[in-house]
From Swiss-Prot:
Protein name: Caveolin-1
Matches recorded under Pfam families: Caveolin (PF01146)
Lipid-attached positions, S-palmitoyl cysteine: C133, C143, C156
Organism: Papio anubis (Olive baboon)
Cytoplasmic domain ranges by topology: 2-104, 126-178
Length: 178
C-alpha cells in the first residue's frame, strides 16, 4: 500500500479497502479518528440551567410582561389620592408576584410533567409514525407519478399540441367604427 492506494498482485491500482481504513467506531486512519474526537457530546439531561435569564429565547416577551401601568391608568383630571395610588401599585405588584409563585409551586411540577409527557408523545409519534408515513407515501407516489408522466407525454402532450396548432392561425382584428 502506498499513499492511500492499494495495488493488487497484477499491478492494478485501487483505493484502500474499507476494512483497512477502519469503521466509524474504531477508525484506523488518523483523520477520521481526529474528526470523531473533536465532536463534543451534548446531553440535554446534564446541561445547566440559567437561574437568572429564564427566558433565553424570549418566548414570553409580548405576553407576560404586564406591569401596573399596563393595566391601570388614571387620565389627567381624574387622579386618586397619592397614597391610594401608591398602595394600589404595591398591592397589584406584590399580589401578582406572590400569587404567580404560589401557582408555580402548586401547579408548576404537575404541569411540567403533563407537558413533558405531551411533548414526549408528540416526538414519539413524529419519529415513529409521521415521518415513516410520509416517506412511504413519497415512495408510493413515485409509481403513480411515473404512470401519470407517461400518460401526459403520450396522450395530453400530442392532444394539446394539436389543439395549439389548430388555433395558432386564428387572428383577431379589432376595428373601431365611428
Amino acid at each position: 500500500m502506498s499513499g492511500g492506494k492499494y495495488v493488487d498482485s497484477e499491478g492494478h491500482l485501487y483505493t484502500v479497502p474499507i476494512r483497512e481504513q477502519g469503521n466509524i467506531y474504531k477508525p484506523n486512519n488518523k483523520a477520521m479518528a481526529d474528526e470523531l474526537s473533536e465532536k463534543q457530546v451534548y446531553d440535554a439531561h446534564t446541561k445547566e440551567i440559567d437561574l437568572v435569564n429564564r427566558d433565553p429565547k424570549h418566548l414570553n416577551d409580548d405576553v407576560v410582561k404586564i406591569d401596573f401601568e399596563d393595566v391601570i391608568a388614571e387620565p389627567e383630571g381624574t387622579h386618586s389620592f397619592d397614597g391610594i395610588w401608591k398602595a394600589s401599585f404595591t398591592t397589584f405588584t406584590v399580589t401578582k408576584y406572590w400569587f404567580y409563585r404560589l401557582l408555580s409551586a402548586l401547579f408548576g411540577i404537575p404541569m411540567a410533567l403533563v407537558w413533558g409527557i405531551y411533548f414526549a408523545i408528540l416526538s414519539f409519534l413524529h419519529i415513529w409514525a409521521v415521518v415513516p408515513c410520509i416517506k412511504s407515501f413519497l415512495i408510493e407516489i413515485q409509481c403513480i407519478s411515473r404512470v401519470y408522466s407517461i400518460y401526459v407525454h403520450t396522450v395530453c402532450d400530442p392532444l394539446f399540441e394539436a389543439v395549439g396548432k389548430i388555433f395558432s392561425n386564428v387572428r383577431i382584428n379589432l376595428q373601431k367604427e365611428i
